[in-house]
Amino acid sequence: MCIRDRIEDNPKMILKEKKNCSMGVAMQMVADGRADAMISAGSTAALVMGGTLIVKRIKGVKRPSLTPVMPGLNNMYILLDGGANVDCRPDMLRQFAVMGSVYMNKIMGVDNPKVGLLNVGAEEEKGRELEQETYALLKNSTLNFTGNVEARNAALGEVDVVVTDGFTGNIYLKTVEGMGKFMKASLKKIFFRNLGTKIGAMFTMKGIKEISKQMDYRETGGSPVSYTHLTLPTKLEV
């Protein structure tokens, strides 16, 4: 089922004043068991809010998480949180790590996914109080926690799950999107500079297109909302 609402609509308006809008109806269908999933091109805030209030969270899950699938050097990886929660506590990030591990294992088929905590350095003592306390929780968990991961290394295959708060995660996500556009525009500018570079481009065009496609965020085009029965098992150790 493909659902589309005007993205400029206010989240509360969609859920309260427009109870019969496509997004609200679709969520109720999922909640009632008449649909197994829904896809929306509407307001992200309304989708997250409606999912929490209508579809409901798995018992024990504190906050939802936007979980974009990101392009990596040798494999795809996921980011939690991509922007649903600006302010997070360490226990929430631990839950994001659990949800991300389950998603990578059950949906992406990755055995024992590697979890990394997005930070300003790889050392254990790096970061704010949030990262330091989260590090301790993940270190003592049963997850395959590999430690802190710097933004520059996240896409190089070091981890399968990148965990951070929604504020940092959204900046990271949009930076990656922007770099993809920058690289595509830069390559085009370089290869079409003169006749010699145009001839060179003819021999490398296939590779350039592959790189551009890999870096294009439209290849994924959306993000699962991790917290409900839509994406996770009904029993979850959190």
Each language-model region and where it sits:
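Conserved small/polar residues in nucleotide/adenosyl-binding loops
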Residues: 1-5, 228-234
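Phosphate/nucleotide-donor binding subsite
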Residues: 4-35
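Short glycine/serine/threonine-rich phosphate/pyrophosphate-binding segments
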Residues: 22-23, 44-51, 127, 171-172
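A glycine- and small-aliphatic-rich helix-loop capping segment at beta-alpha/alpha-beta transitions
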Residues: 46, 50-67, 133-138, 181-182
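Glycine-rich phosphate/nucleotide-binding loop
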Residues: 55-63, 71-79, 158-162, 166-232
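Short, glycine-/small-residue-rich phosphate/pyrophosphate-handling segment
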Residues: 71-104, 218-222
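Glycine-rich phosphate/diphosphate-binding loop of Rossmann-like nucleotide-binding domains
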Residues: 87-147
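Flexible, glycine/charged-enriched surface loops at secondary-structure junctions
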Residues: 107-115, 144-152, 193-202, 217-223
